[in-house]
């Protein structure tokens, strides 16, 4: 007998999945009240302490507001959530609204260029050593996804500011799920190879050149992502002025 994937979850995980996906898909819209604790626990088949534990954690992240003696209310998580909400969101990439990945890439466009510049300034040999491995990448989406993620984290961890790596690490699950889609496209892999070569040359030139190369590549990756999503049946917003070079 084939088990439902939800049957493999621990009770707290099941409650989290039910509540988060119900908020993301609009079952519980912003401002809506959740069923009372007794009713919701019975509906989900969990104990009230388990439900209470998950509710408190989701409230801390900004998903809901608990009013003692009154119904628990669903927040506008996009406006009231904190950074910890990203870690929870990353588990449910299939439920994210259209355009959310593009918004994340825009955040990375703002953050990663100065991070790369700092890393190239402080530890150029470390970054160059890793970039040298790009020559051995095979035409495989998983391999490109792993390499590109490790490059970003390497730059963040060598920027001499630990906050950068903490923020970037919150994107891990979302990034890896979308990167497999992105790097399944041959043009995306070619663009990334170009990016890695140009980044190598920029590090040998100057930190300012590094920042410029990364900024251009991150902007181009947004356009490439939108094109890939369009071809795979997602939303179609394509920048006709982009060049085909950029890593995800």
Regions found by a protein language model. Name each.
Residues 1-110:
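Short linear motifs at protein or domain termini
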Residues 7-8, 14, 52, 56, ...:
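Juxtamembrane/interface motifs at transmembrane-helix termini
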Residues 18-22, 110, 114, 133, ...:
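Solvent-exposed, charged/polar functional surfaces in cytosolic regulatory/catalytic domains
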Residues 36-37, 160-162, 205-206:
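Short loop-to-helix capping motifs
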Residues 56, 116-120, 156-160, 180, ...:
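Amphipathic alpha-helical interaction elements
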Residues 79-154, 194-216:
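All-alpha effector-binding/dimerization core of bacterial HTH-type transcriptional repressors
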Residues 135-136, 152, 169-248:
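C-terminal all-alpha effector/ligand-binding and dimerization domain
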Residues 157-160, 164-170:
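Long, low-complexity, charge-rich intrinsically disordered regions
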